[in-house]
Swiss-Prot record:
Subcellular localization(s) per the UniProt record: Cytoplasm; Secreted; Cell surface
Record's GO cellular component terms: cell surface; extracellular region; phosphopyruvate hydratase complex
Family, per entry: Belongs to the enolase family.
GO BP terms, alphabetized: glycolytic process
Catalytic activity: (2R)-2-phosphoglycerate = phosphoenolpyruvate + H2O
EC identifiers of the protein: 4.2.1.11
Protein name: Enolase
Pathway stated in the Swiss-Prot or TrEMBL entry: Carbohydrate degradation; glycolysis; pyruvate from D-glyceraldehyde 3-phosphate: step 4/5
Length: 424
């Protein structure tokens, strides 16, 4: 009854107007699942490969080759298989691809099918996706990391760090957390406008003002939290995504906006200084993706009191994560489904992290769609944190709105992670 009878891949557009893959999966019993694949702007060198067409069409960014793989080879290989056997389906696609990084068929093709299969199986079981994937204990609503100021590769301004986020840990519920974040977001907009800054929003819905440094951005955020009626370091904390690989050159960290170049040890000390001055509870990619010594220095310095998240470092890859665990590097993994390219491998990465007492943060990409799958996966894995952009742009709000629905569905079972995510 849950055999796959049809798979339809198509090329659609993401939130940046670039092509991406969408997949429909139909089952024998009439059940249906649809998934759209996200895409990143700053990508790690060790990520699974997103297949693009090249040439002049869509300026080389078309995904017709990946769509053809979905409608051709992949359907031929998994048509007739039971949608409830996720691991078998994913493994069949890995073997069909035959490369270590999914570069032949494309991680975008494989992931689209993988997620759509899970959604179809959930519908066949009469369960919401979070319950189907997570089982009866899926009940924890994540603390949002809300990206309200953008720099780096996500903005055309002098700020070197890529994202400045707020985390409403003092909320009682996810719904309250979204409200608190929205209030701070709109307060920040007024503060920026009053000081003559641009308030246009970037790829992820955050503002990209012409501020010169990380401290300048953090000072604005502190003022906005207070003006919105909340207490920094009590109701609301701050998280950073440095995306340090983007400015790591010849073994040094070149902070052009701040006019200085730092050795890895000095970069670690600078981040420790910021974490001491501001209520920063999470730093993502504080060091470059292959600067393992720098990561170790940063972890030794503040890993006992600050969440240190590996994004480009781990790329949702359990093998790289295990290397980091052995070396005592970082203490958290950012989980992006398209970095690894399948649902089963994504779940394995979260499980590997939790077994080692590392935290996991479910994450969007800068190129998103209205697909809200990651909201369900955050609850399914009880990971307790989600990074899905600002309080603007419907591609970001789709995830927050889905979390509000899930919290409502769970009723008294629902628990907001809140302060439980804090270290030290």
């Amino acid at each position: 009854m849950t055999a796959i009878i049809d798979i339809i891949g198509r090329e659609i557009l993401d939130s940046r107007g670039n092509p991406t893959v969408e997949v429909d999966v139909h089952l024998e019993d009439g059940s249906f699942g649809r998934a759209a694949v996200p895409s990143g702007a700053s990508t790690g060198a060790h990520e699974a490969v997103e297949l693009r067409d090249g040439g002049t069409r869509y300026l080389g960014k078309g995904v017709e080759r990946a769509v053809d793989a979905v409608n051709g080879e992949i359907f031929e290989a998994i048509g007739g298989l039971d949608a409830e056997n996720q691991i078998q389906i994913d493994r069949t696609m890995f073997e069909l691809d035959g490369t270590p990084n999914k570069s032949r068929l494309g991680a975008n093709a494989i992931l689209g099918v993988s997620l759509a299969v899970a959604k179809a199986a959930a519908e066949a079981a009469g369960l919401p996706l979070y319950r189907y994937v997570g089982g009866p204990n899926a009940h924890l609503l994540p603390v949002p990391m809300m990206n309200i100021i953008n720099g780096g590769a996500h903005a055309d301004n002098p700020i070197d760090f890529q994202e400045f986020m707020i985390m409403p840990v003092g909320a009682e519920t996810l719904k309250d957390a979204v409200r608190m974040g929205s209030e701070v977001f709109h307060t920040l907009k007024k503060q920026l406008a009053a000081d003559g800054h641009n308030t246009n929003v970037g790829d992820e819905g955050g503002f990209a003002p012409g501020l010169a440094s990380a401290p300048a951005a953090l000072d604005f955020i502190m003022k906005s939290i207070e003006k919105a009626g909340y207490r920094p370091g009590e109701d609301m904390y701050v998280a950073l995504d440095c995306a340090s690989t983007e400015f790591f050159k010849d073994g040094k960290y070149v902070l052009e906006g701040e006019g200085r170049t730092l050795e890895p040890g000095a970069m670690a000390e600078y981040l420790a200084e910021l974490a001491g001055k501001y209520p920063i509870v999470s730093i993502e990619d504080g060091m470059a993706e292959d600067d393992w010594d720098g990561w170790k220095a940063l972890t030794d310095l503040i890993g006992n009191k600050c969440q240190l998240v590996g994004d480009d470092l781990f790329v949702t890859n359990s093998a790289r994560l295990r290397d980091g665990i052995k070396m005592g590097v970082a203490n958290s993994i950012l989980v992006k489904v398209n970095q690894i390219g399948s649902l089963s491998e994504t779940l394995d990465a979260v499980e590997t992290a939790h077994k080692a007492r590392y935290t996991a943060v479910m994450s969007h990409r800068s190129g998103e769609t209205e697909d809200s799958t990651i909201a369900d996966l955050a609850v399914a894995t009880n990971c307790g944190q989600i990074k899905t952009g600002s309080l603007a742009r419907s591609d970001r709000l789709a995830k927050y709105n889905q979390l509000i629905r899930i919290e409502e569905q769970l009723g008294p079972q629902a628990q907001y992670a809140g302060r439980s995510i804090l270290r030290g």
